[in-house]
Amino acid sequence: ISALNLNTPLIESGSAKRLLKQSTEQVRTKPVSEKFTGEIVVTPDCLSDFLGFITGDISDGKIISKTSIYKEKLNQQITDPRFTLHAQPVSDEITDGYFITDDGYVAENNTIIDNGVLKTHLLSLYGANKTGGERAVNGGGAFVVDAGEKPKDEIIRNIKKGILLERFSGGRPSADGEFSGVAKNSY
């Protein structure tokens, strides 16, 4: 939890209360009774793991080494069209943003993925010079995801078979973007 003031009790901040409740519910874990194919609803607390996979793949290391699955995907669809991701390090609504990039430029807010379309790689000046790409106006982080049209409860109610993914434990995706892991604090 990051905050500019401590006027709100810690337990009421962010998702602390919900996560602590889930931890008590997970004392006696139960395996899924059978293998199934279904839908995944990824909660905001879990989403950062998956965002890290994407942003790591569009940053200097993977773009310079040409191992990114997104290296030739600028202005192309890479996610569901309902997904929009912004990096807003200088937004007044972000308490743990930043004003200067790692390579010394003034940071700006931007949109990384717009309605599923990759709009930028997160290249530093070094990465841009090495690849001929464009230097990003920020280094990512301070993420804001646009809200969908339906509340979480309605989404869950309309799923016949699936999982509400609250925590994920797994390795980095393979070179082709596939991943595997364990669902934790999930229902």
Predicted segments with their positions:
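Extended amphipathic alpha-helical scaffolds
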Residues: 1-11, 43, 55, 64-86
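Internal alpha/beta scaffold segment
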Residues: 1-54, 58
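Generic preference for well-ordered secondary structure
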Residues: 3-7, 24, 58, 63, ...
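Dual-mode signal for accessory low-complexity, basic/Gly-rich regions
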Residues: 73-187
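An exposure/low-complexity boundary signal
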Residues: 33-70, 164-187
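Conserved active-site and cofactor/substrate-binding residues in soluble primary-metabolism enzymes
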Residues: 11-18, 35, 45, 49, ...
